[in-house]
């Protein structure tokens, strides 16, 4: 039997059709309390822009609220898309969070803009090339370090100094993996929506991992992989709930702007095969089936942790899946 690695949750704060962003955020905070109670290791908020059905845009604000309503769980960004942000402001925001909530804050960093080219331009402040990304991380570590000063300039941040907020590199390709490895940082791989290079990325990350890099934070490679999960008491219920996710991905593909759709008869979803190919890393079914799928993935990849993404039209169904998963995994 493969190891039951720690489980975490990735939240995109979905907005069901007919609901408001306020509803989505409230449901998300309810789920945060539940995740804390159930023993999940971390709860990370994504960053998305110009999307109708998602309310995770200002991640640091969601993290602050979630950390305030929970006690034990680590809360973090999955992730901050660095091309959209000035690193000093990221240091100040996450340093402030660490000062308020102690060692419970994680900072996952990505190089993608998390949106379409036009919106990216509206947000943009800098290049997304690997060298700037590495330089930004080096500066962030300076601000989070005991001296509280950037590595590239004598700029001080009182609110981040000495907080040592752990930094993760997010990526879905071999390029992201090689950056994470060379910098000696933990790697969160976006297998939940970008399955193409996952196996190669994990392998390359471990191969190039450099524990003696000036940015290194850990002594050996650490991989957390994203997985789409929908666990219900029966296979049939799970398959039906899963149609909400299929519809969501097909909407993105077709440029359709609407909230999360109610579940439908699985046979009625046109192009469901396309959605499932993007969502190759999915565990959908009853407890036994889902646990088996996750065990198999952990066995094949030897990842250190899984971060699950679960979407449902009705927030109660999402929480039911989290509860069943915790009961059957922990």
Where are these regions (language model features)?
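An alpha-helical appendage that flanks or caps ligand/catalytic pockets
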Residues: 3, 127-156, 197-303, 330
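Hydrophobic faces of well-ordered beta-strands that scaffold small-molecule active sites
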Residues: 7-11, 43-45, 75-77, 105-109, ...
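Active-site mouth loops of central-metabolism enzymes
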Residues: 11-26, 80-88, 161-171, 232, ...
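Short, acidic/polar
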Residues: 22-34, 172-178, 289-296
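A conserved active-site cap/scaffold subdomain adjacent to cofactor or substrate pockets
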Residues: 175-196, 201-202
């Amino acid at each position: 039997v493969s190891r039951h690695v720690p489980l975490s949750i990735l939240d995109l704060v979905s907005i069901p059709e007919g609901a408001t962003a306020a509803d989505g955020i409230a449901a998300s905070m309810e789920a945060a309390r539940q995740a804390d109670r159930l023993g999940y290791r971390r709860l990370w908020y994504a960053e998305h822009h110009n999307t109708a059905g998602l309310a995770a845009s200002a991640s640091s604000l969601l993290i602050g609220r979630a950390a305030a309503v929970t006690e034990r769980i680590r809360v973090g960004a999955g992730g901050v898309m660095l091309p959209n942000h000035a690193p000093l402001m990221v240091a100040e925001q996450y340093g402030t969070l660490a000062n308020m909530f102690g060692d419970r804050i994680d900072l996952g960093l990505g190089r993608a803009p998390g949106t379409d080219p036009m919106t990216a331009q509206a947000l943009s402040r800098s290049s997304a090339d690997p060298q700037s990304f590495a330089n930004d991380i080096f500066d962030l570590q300076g601000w989070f370090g005991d001296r509280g000063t950037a590595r590239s300039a004598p700029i001080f941040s009182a609110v981040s100094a000495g907080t040592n907020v752990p930094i993760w590199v997010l990526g879905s390709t071999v390029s992201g993996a090689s950056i994470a490895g060379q910098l000696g940082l933990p790697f969160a791989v976006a297998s939940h929506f970008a399955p193409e290079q996952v196996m190669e990325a994990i392998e390359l990350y471990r191969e190039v991992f450099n524990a003696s890099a000036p940015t290194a934070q850990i002594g050996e490679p650490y991989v957390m992989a994203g997985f789409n999960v929908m666990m219900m008491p029966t296979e049939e219920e799970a398959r039906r709930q899963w149609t909400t996710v299929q519809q969501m991905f097909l909407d993105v593909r077709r440029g359709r702007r609407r909230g999360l759709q109610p579940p439908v008869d699985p046979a009625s979803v046109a192009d469901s095969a396309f959605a499932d190919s993007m969502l190759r890393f999915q565990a959908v079914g009853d407890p036994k089936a889902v646990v088996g799928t996750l065990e198999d993935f952990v066995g094949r990849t030897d990842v250190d942790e899984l971060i699950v993404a679960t979407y449902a039209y009705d927030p109660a169904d999402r929480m039911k899946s989290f509860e069943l998963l915790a009961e059957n995994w922990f």
